[in-house]
Amino acid sequence: GSQTTTAKIGDYFPITENTKYVYEGMGNEYASYTVYNDYTEADKLQQRLNNGGTETVNIIQIFEGKLIKVFAESEIYYRENFLVKQDNDTEILLMEPLQKGNSWTLTDGRVRSITDTEASVSTPLGDYKAVEVTTESGNGKNIDYYAKDVGLVKSIFKEGETEISSSLAQIEKDVPLIQNINFYYPNINDEKIYYKNVAVNFYTNDVTREKLAQAYKGEPVANTGKVFSENTQINSLYLNDDGMVYLDLNKAFLQEMNAGAGYEAMILQSIANTFGQYYNAEKVILTIEGKPYESGHIALQEGEYLQVNYDNVIEGS
């Protein structure tokens, strides 16, 4: 009808916050997945897609009448804002005008076209009228359905007798992404490091370093000491291209630490393990206000890192 001619991509791909989408798969163990938007801007989102096998970060942008996947990377289990990133190879998911027959060729040679604007689709969550997008490749085809004010409601892959589908089963609003994170603490009495697994809630656009600092100030494992004192703050935290985690703390961390040399070394080991493990890295560069870590007992040289070490580590409670 006439209303579809003025339809905008934003109507069919809303940018949501604090919302979890659950897709039910058929035909393949990895066809079931969840989606959560870690970060959003006015016309752009960074989604975390978890299919039980891996977690993939996708950045999707609405730009000049196109819905474009500008960045994708799998095996990203940590939260980091990648909204500025862009791959050389971007993929147009949907394009205006949202009219039957609108067609475009992808960089890999596949042809994608709008094959219906009012397709009837049934999912476990309900029935929708959707824009149907068909992508033809050599052997098979993908069909994606976008419903107004909802977004992607169903995807189907067909090849010969094979059919794999993912259908929207649940939309959970006002919920966080929950990550289970190990926090490590030193026990000076037995000279061992204990960890406890903490469920940390991240809402859309939460700043990871702030949430981790807050969680690290929580109740430590019994008979262990605190690692982050009350006024400790993380100034910056990221996984660098060199594979090392860069962690910069404020002066309060040093000023409020009351530890002998051996205990201080255990505190630093606890930090290395906590942040190294979160980013699945082996090495952590620790600085204070941008300068190499230096206390009365321990001085790290420029570029000297703390090595993650799980020997003598015990699960606490």
Briefly describe each language-model feature range:
Residues 3-178:
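Conserved functional acidic sites
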Residues 1-3, 161-317:
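Bimodal "functional hotspot" detector
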